[in-house]
Amino acid sequence: MNTLLVGINVAVMLILVGVLYYMQRKHVSFNKRVFTALGVGIIFGLILQFIYEPTSKVIIESNTWFGLIGSGYVKLLQMIVMPLILVSIISAFTKLQLTKNLGKISGLIIGILILTTGIAAAVGIAASAGFDVSATGLQQGDAESARLKLVEERFTSIEKTTIPDKLLELLPTNPFLDLTGARPTSTISVVIFAAFIGIAFIGVKRKYPEQAELFKKMLDAVYAIVMRMVTLILRLTPYGVLALMAKTVAGSDINAILKLGNFVLASYVALIVMFVIHLLLIALSGLNPIQYLKKVFPVLTFAFTSRSSAGAMPLNIEAQKEKLGISEGIANFAASFGVSIGQNGCAGIYPAMLAMMVAPTVGIDPLQPQFILTLIAVVAISSFGVAGVGGGATFAALIVLSTMNLPIGIVALVISVEPLIDMGRTALNVSGSMTAGLISSKWLGELDQDTYNQDDTKTGEIAS
């Protein structure tokens, strides 16, 4: 019986995929197809929730099949991330886009990411205080106990890693290993390796222009092929969003969400407020924030449904270059750094809120100005340190809580709502990296404002 029900669910999913394909054949805009996929995925997931239990075998097996589309799409994006970063950054050097301002570009992007993370921490603190979020009364079940054990094991290894060791982890001792994404710091390591190749190219160009020109032509050919691969994968975005959204909603435990409803609500209020701050920063830079919102919507939608900042990188880079008019070098640096450094959602809002929740349990008044200022500073600085250990929100929270001498057990107690909150956090992370790239490009005078201000026509190219 279960097999029949699973078959029906999969058949419905395939029909919905067929509808999206029909929309593509009718040349419905890319944005509309992504938005349709998001809405239909939510509705389909809710229907499955209503018919079955989230933990039922039917839902579990159906989600496994849905994963062929959703997780398959994410894996394709992850496949292209490293080649895209490597080729794009080297290409930026060969096109003389990163010859003079390399240090200024890197410093400005990282500075904006860390600054906005500090602001995000303040927003998280305000949301926690406003909604009176507290760890008191949270119960530890079997799932939470298992998660706590894993958290404590991981924390032990993080605690032993010194700051110099974290910084050394960023260097690519084996670039071919990092191209496989084997280490938490692989993304930044590939950026550094690509920058070294680019700098070497500039030196070779001065002494041996013929060899440099040959390398440039070869790289241009590889770049064209990689970008064609990116375009082919991006066309699958609506199908990936549909499957990921249906899978997430169908498998969510509504009862657990309701128990931690106050925390979930406070988290999303903080995420929305921080996103509005991104728009305000863009407006203060002399750019139209509505134009930004319209052009990055598909990227944020995918980040929301996939919960993968790294998986969203190809869309992130494509949107920055082709839609926002950001120069190639800045777009690649902003997207790459944003995966590991200064994540507004995972390393900003989330750790700050957990610290505010757990502080009263050890006799600390979380509303004391000294505690708040210290927490904001620790969150901002730690958001850079996370780059050396990886692990996203969980380990960002571990670093902050341990630095503040607070219990780390709270990280395990919110496991039941982790997927739901992580969706919003990831979207904010990606928005933060694009905001950093946009503002940096504007301040350095490298923004193509004609591209930024024109109507979005690039989505049509992806669709064709």
Swiss-Prot record:
* Compartments reported by the entry: Membrane
UniProt keyword list: Amino-acid transport, Membrane, Transmembrane, Transmembrane helix, Transport
One family from Pfam that matches here is SDF
- SUPFAM superfamilies associated with the record: Proton glutamate symport protein (SSF118215)
List, alphabetically, the InterPro entries matched: Na-dicarboxylate_symporter (IPR001991), Na:dicarbo_symporter_sf (IPR036458)
What membrane topology does the annotation report for this chain?
Multi-pass membrane protein
Is Kinase among this UniProt entry's keywords? no
UniProt entry tagged with the keyword Membrane: yes
**GO CC list:** plasma membrane
Could you give a GO molecular-function term held by this entry?
Answer: L-cystine transmembrane transporter activity
**Chain segments annotated as transmembrane:** 3-23, 34-54, 73-93, 107-127, 184-204, 225-245, 263-283, 347-367, 371-391, 395-415
**Role played:** Mediates uptake of L-cystine, the oxidized form of L-cysteine.
Q: Which family does it belong to?
A: Belongs to the dicarboxylate/amino acid:cation symporter (DAACS) (TC 2.A.23) family.
Name of the protein described by the UniProt record: L-cystine uptake protein TcyP
